[in-house]
Amino acid sequence: MANKPSPGELKNGLSEMQFYVTQHHGTEPPFTGRLLHNKKNGVYHCLVCDAPLFNSQTKYDSGCGWPSFYEPVSDEAIRYLTDNSHGMQRIEIRCGNCDAHLGHVFPDGPQPTGERYCVNSASLSFTDEQNGEQIKG
């Protein structure tokens, strides 16, 4: 995958939770993510490689405890993998650019797509379209 930092660079540049989530397919505890309640307009990026993933206009409150979106910025932004871990059948979502784990997608979202991209805050950064401020999850 393109633009992925070395394991050493990642270990030094990410918090313990960010590293666990993005590199070891972890999940942050629900309702704890820094970007869960973010209501600003802008773009959510991959924390590892800064690739754009989701527009704020597609974010909604699903009540699940993680930031939820109904569609990515492009078809290429997200990579999909079958995940049969923990006795469940799910679709894992990863960054299409660097392969960082983001979360999962479920078929219970709102229209127009009917999908819920359930994403760990720890795998995202957000860039505010008004002032360019970047917030890391």
UniProtKB/Swiss-Prot annotation:
EC number(s): the record gives 1.8.4.12
GO MF terms listed in the record are: peptide-methionine (R)-S-oxide reductase activity; zinc ion binding
Entry-linked InterPro entries: Met_Sox_Rdtase_MsrB, Met_Sox_Rdtase_MsrB_dom, Mss4-like_sf
This protein's UniProt keywords = Metal-binding, Oxidoreductase, Zinc
- Its catalytic activity? L-methionyl-[protein] + [thioredoxin]-disulfide + H2O = L-methionyl-(R)-S-oxide-[protein] + [thioredoxin]-dithiol
Q: Could you mention a single GO BP entry for this protein?
A: protein repair
Q: Where is the MsrB domain?
A: 7-129
Tell me which GO cellular component terms the UniProt record holds: cytoplasm
* Residues annotated as binding Zn(2+): C46, C49, C95, C98
Q: Which family does it belong to?
A: Belongs to the MsrB Met sulfoxide reductase family.
Name of the protein in question? Peptide methionine sulfoxide reductase MsrB
**Source species of the chain:** Klebsiella pneumoniae (strain 342)
What's the encoding gene here?
msrB
